[in-house]
Design a protein with these regions (language model features):
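Short amphipathic alpha-helical interface segments
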Residues: 2-15
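Short acidic, hydrophobic short linear motifs in intrinsically disordered regions
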Residues: 13-26, 37
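Short, structured loop/turn "capping" segments at alpha-beta junctions
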Residues: 15-17, 32-33, 47
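Short amphipathic alpha-helical interaction segments
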Residues: 27-42
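A short, conserved structural fragment
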Residues: 41-52
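Minor-groove-contacting beta-hairpin "wing" of winged helix-turn-helix DNA-binding domains
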Residues: 53-61
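Long, low-complexity, charge-rich intrinsically disordered regions
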Residues: 71-187
Length: 187
């Protein structure tokens, strides 16, 4: 559902899209996209319209209102965080966590760079997990394993702002909260 939400979030206002196109783009089954759009419609966030034999969907709100109305339902996409040696990172990954936030705000970057990949990537099983406390932080990378593929909505090598904000759910750090507010002002 969150992937469907994000796909519509990043479209322009008033734009509609065929449900089948969203399913293809995001690699979702017909069942998954049907369930997702039904949930979004139930929440009053989108409408579904018949378009010939297809069904088109569009947001009921401007981008900002759409996000505001949904943010209570959005989940943290991070399943698990692992630490690996930097030289192992030969796969495509996206700037995430405090690393991504520091690129968009005044926040200082974390001691160990944070990146995101989809938990279902084949490479995940081959990664050797290390204990960051016994390694030089400069040689380490923190890898967030995401529940959905961050590549679908990534921009300029960085995870998308709304998903990034979701990764900090429950974080009490004021500097982070302020940086996220600033980041989301541009929605």
């Amino acid at each position: 559902t969150q992937m469907g939400f994000l796909e519509l979030l990043y479209m322009s206002d008033e734009e509609s899209v065929l449900k089948s196109e969203v399913a293809n783009k995001l690699n979702l089954t017909k069942t998954s996209i049907t369930r997702a759009t039904a949930q979004l419609e139930e929440m009053g966030l989108i409408q579904q319209m018949k378009s010939g034999t297809e069904i088109a969907i569009k947001r009921n709100y401007s981008r900002k209102e759409y996000y505001e109305n949904a943010k209570g339902y959005l989940i943290n996409p991070v399943q698990k965080v692992i630490t690996i040696m930097r030289y192992e990172a030969t796969f495509e990954s996206f700037s995430a966590g405090e690393t991504a936030l520091s690129q968009e705000s005044e926040l200082n970057p974390p001691r160990i760079e944070e990146r995101a990949i989809y938990k279902g990537e084949e490479v995940v099983d081959q990664l050797e997990i290390v204990d960051a406390r016994s390694e030089d932080p400069d040689d380490c990378l923190k890898i967030q394993l995401w529940k959905y593929n961050p590549s679908y909505f990534a921009r300029e090598g960085c995870v998308n702002p709304v998903s990034l904000a979701c990764t900090f759910k429950g974080n009490e750090d004021e500097r982070i909260e302020m940086s996220i507010e600033k980041l989301l002002e541009e929605l």
